A protein has these predicted regions:
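Periplasmic c-type cytochrome electron-transfer domains
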Residues: 15, 22-31, 37-682
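N-terminal Lys/Arg-rich, disordered targeting/topogenic segments
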Residues: 1-25
Length: 682
């Protein structure tokens, strides 16, 4: 120890001698300051370095059928009225990385953050900034400026990579992390870029020059608007977006959607800080190519109606809305609910999705199907999986509705009888109902959390986290997120219909297939059909199992830690590669909310047991069938597949779909409307 102290003292003396040898004090001080600045710059540059995956893509192949190119483009870039706190489209296109002159939203950077960019894509009328899938834009009705609009496709488009080929999965689950406020991720890098641009003159000059040129008056207006945006960004980061509220890292491909929606709506929008709740149950973005068939949607199956689901989602994705005044008091009827939520855009996207089919296994890229093995898997699926995953076709429902004040036949917490009766009504056994327009529906069974055994955190948070909604209903008791959204949306959606000119005759269609808005609260998860599930890793609702092979394996054989972010696909086990790579996140299943328990195939009586222990041969047979399950191209080879997706009824025709798409595009893209075409109603 004494020798170590002498060594340190000698080092101090050597540094003092070096300091004196640099020359007189007037020279040493500037040298010291310069050295500190250079060191600080390099430290900051390292700290702010983007956390990017490294991917090399030579070609893109689209695996879903049912869509024309125009329909795909409609899904990718139709706005729904969300915003990124007012970030203008041209601002995002022209911002630079922190401490760099490189464009922040370059193809390489955006792909590195997990967004989807086709190497061959070029600027187009609907995507003039050449941004990734889902980065749409809408026109602010007050200023005429175009804002970044985070569209449905951003979270619900997937991509699998295999040896340089990107396999596009329309309607699949994305692998971006736009909500994750971790060092080097998109949202934190954007924030650093905004504040550096605002306060570093040389960076501001480059930014302003690209946007408005040299005119000082226009530059002053730009700076005022940009500063206002930076203030919103800061306020949100200290409120609904505060990292402390999201202690379980979401990472690539996940977000606690319901928890974030609740924090935004009941905390940020209602200006009620006491409503912020810890949201620590991240879930994978669900795949959506068949949701129009479902009776109930979301992982816990808590709602049923397309329009209410989409409006609620848009509010959670920061669609600006006026609910309260500057004093936090509820606004009067003249101002309440002012928002840019795009009802036409939502109806356009929802209707377009009905034509989308699941992805087809590409034998030319991922390997030929072993038909004999797939036939064995078909029998195993019927024995072990069908009872939960179905599909379970059912006669469409006749939903009882209220037709006058005081009625509540569905026993909901809140009901808007005028909206209920605005649909297409009929009588069944003396009860006024809305008859669902679908020929058949898929009935999704709820499986209680203590039966399925998967991580219960998401369902538990949904049931037990309570929010004060008394500003909306004075004197009311605290409610969970589902009931609170019902209270708000029962009032808001009819207002939006009036604003967008939706006639009384059109309400049933815009609601979605004449379905009234309902909420169901259960400590359970729904069990959905699995067409195309091979293309949607990782698995279970929280993404805690990397491959389907692992999911079919005993719990002790499932990985307890693995990395997420690498989109390179494993066609043997049906999942992503899980080794560490730049840009990846560690998924630790020991953390509550991340657990990989349940959904077990075992001969032991254990919580979460759903089937018998599978041999290696049985697992591989199931995997082979899952690759082609329901695919009509393999129906004959499989000696008739009862899950052939072409055997299920087609969606009802939507006579208002084309007009809704055209109205949305005409408003937001007036200069390009003549160049847009749509492939609906095929």
């Amino acid at each position: 120890m004494l020798g170590g102290a002498k060594w340190l003292w000698g080092l101090v003396l050597a540094l003092i001698d070096l300091w004196r040898a640099l020359g007189p004090l007037w020279l040493r001080i500037p040298l010291l300051v310069g050295g500190v600045l250079i060191l600080g710059y390099h430290v900051a540059q390292h700290y702010l370095r983007p956390n990017l995956t490294q991917e090399t893509i030579y070609q893109v192949k689209y695996l879903n059928t049912g869509w024309s190119d125009e329909q795909r483009n409609t899904f990718y870039y139709t706005p729904q009225g969300t915003e990124l706190l007012g970030l203008e489209y041209d601002w995002l296109v022209n911002l630079e990385l922190p401490l760099s002159v490189e464009r922040l939203a370059s193809e390489e950077n955006m792909r590195g953050w997990g967004f989807i960019v086709d190497p061959q894509q070029r600027p187009s009328p609907t995507n003039p900034g050449n941004l990734p899938v889902g980065f749409a834009r809408h026109t602010d009705q007050q200023t005429g400026r175009q804002k970044v609009d985070l569209g449905c496709a951003m979270c619900h488009t997937g991509e699998l990579h295999y040896q340089g080929t990107a396999l596009r999965i329309d309607g699949g689950q994305s692998m971006q992390s736009i909500a994750t406020a971790q060092r080097g991720e998109f949202i934190t890098t954007l924030g650093a870029s905004v504040f550096e641009t605002l306060y570093v003159p040389t960076k501001w000059d480059r930014f302003a020059e690209r946007l408005v040129g040299d005119d000082e008056e226009t530059r002053a207006k730009l700076k005022k608007a940009f500063k206002a945006f930076s203030s919103k960004l800061k306020d949100f980061a200290q409120g609904a977006g505060a990292a402390r509220l999201y202690p379980v890292v979401e990472g690539r491909g996940r977000t606690d959607a319901v928890g974030r929606i609740a924090n935004v709506v009941f905390g940020f929008d209602l200006d009620e800080e006491s409503n912020y709740r810890v949201a620590d149950a991240p879930a994978s973005y669900p795949f959506i190519w068949d949701i129009w068939r479902f009776d109930w949607v979301q992982y816990t199956g808590f709602t049923n109606q397309a329009m209410a689901r989409n409006v609620g989602e848009s509010l959670g994705v920061l669609a600006p809305i006026k609910l309260v005044n500057q004093q936090g008091e509820l606004l009067g009827p003249e101002e309440f609910g002012e928002t840019v939520v795009d009802i036409d855009g939502m109806h356009c996207v929802e209707g377009t999705l009905r034509d989308l089919k699941p992805p087809s296994w590409p034998e030319d890229i991922l390997g030929k199907i072993d038909i004999a093995q797939a036939l064995q898997g078909k029998e195993l699926f019927a024995e072990q999986c069908h009872s939960c995953h179905g599909p379970h076709p059912s006669r469409s429902y006749a939903w009882p509705v209220a037709t006058e004040p005081g009625q509540n036949p569905a026993k909901e917490l809140a009901v808007n009888w005028q909206w209920d009766k605005a649909g297409q009504l009929s009588e069944v056994d003396g009860q006024t109902v809305r008859q669902d327009w679908r020929e058949t529906i898929w009935s999704l069974p709820w499986v209680a959390t203590d039966v399925i055994g998967t991580d219960p955190k998401l369902a538990s948070n949904f049931m037990h986290n309570k929010y004060d909604a008394s500003k909306l209903v004075p004197g009311s008791e605290p409610v969970n997120a589902g009931d609170g959204l019902q209270v708000l949306l029962n009032r808001l959606v009819p207002l939006l219909y009036r604003k967008w000119g939706v006639s009384e005759e059109q309400v049933a269609n815009f609601d979605g297939l004449n379905v009234p808005f309902r909420i169901e609260n259960k400590l359970a998860y729904t069990s959905r059909p699995l067409h195309g599930v091979w293309a949607t890793p990782p698995f279970l609702h929280n993404g805690s199992v990397p491959t389907i092979y692992d999911l079919l394996s005993p719990l002790r054989a499932r990985p307890t830690t693995f990395y997420v972010g690498n989109r390179e696909y494993d066609p043997k086990k049906l999942g992503y590669k899980t080794s560490y790579a730049p840009g990846s996140f560690l998924h630790d299943t020991a953390i509550e909310g991340n657990r990989n328990s349940g959904h077990l195939f075992t001969d032991e009586e254990a919580p979460g047991r759903i089937g018998d222990l599978l041999t290696e041969a049985q697992r591989m047979a199931l995997l082979e069938y899952i690759k082609v399950m329901g695919n009509p191209q393999f129906d004959q080879a499989l000696q008739g597949d009862p899950l052939n997706w072409d055997n299920f009824p087609s969606p009802p025709q939507d006579p208002q779909l084309r007009a809704a798409c055209e109205r949305s595009h005409r408003w937001h893209f007036p200069q390009t409307t003549a160049q847009l075409s749509h492939g609906h109603g095929k």
